[in-house]
């Protein structure tokens, strides 16, 4: 089974709400994680067994770079700040619910989530796996990639693949 998700005719959030089940095991590789994406999927994410998340670029790691190289680490800081919302989620940050969402998300993370970071200089393509279903490519875990807000991309093409394609991404 191969389906195309364009976030116009078929929205990733809606598809995930039907794909994620109680006891699901999820793996995500993406450049950033947003508490607002968690909020949109909270109902189903609270019921999963586990989520393994890997940042596709070095994020939340201790710097060991020379002083001359540090000036080029601004994108990493932006990825880390995206935890509390990207530039497209400003409207949500202004609703004064950020503290409550962050607390709920932190509690959920403590019980069900493992975070890791790609600490190499090698590129990783983002994807998401829910049990036996893979979504690829997946750039970020934000409301833009979920199809709730419009981002800077001219178009979105996420492919939903079932068995046997999904097992190679675990």
Which sequence ranges carry the predicted segments?
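PLD/PLD-like phosphodiesterase catalytic module centered on the HKD motif
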Residues: 1-170
């Amino acid at each position: 089974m191969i389906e195309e998700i364009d976030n116009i005719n078929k929205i990733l959030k809606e598809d995930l709400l039907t794909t994620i089940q109680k006891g699901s095991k999820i793996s995500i590789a993406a450049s950033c994680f947003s508490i607002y994406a968690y909020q949109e999927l909270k109902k189903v994410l609270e019921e999963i067994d586990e989520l393994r998340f890997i940042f596709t670029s070095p994020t939340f790691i201790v710097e060991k770079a020379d002083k001359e190289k540090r000036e080029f680490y601004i994108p990493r800081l932006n990825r880390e700040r995206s935890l509390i919302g990207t530039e497209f989620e400003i409207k949500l940050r202004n609703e004064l619910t950020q503290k409550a969402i962050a607390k709920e998300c932190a509690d959920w993370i403590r019980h069900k989530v493992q975070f890791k970071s790609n600490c190499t200089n090698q590129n990783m393509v983002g994807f998401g796996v829910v049990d036996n279903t893979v979504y690829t490519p997946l750039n970020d875990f934000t409301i833009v990639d979920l199809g709730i807000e419009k981002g800077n991309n001219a178009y979105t093409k996420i492919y939903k693949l079932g068995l046997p394609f999904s097992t190679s991404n675990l």
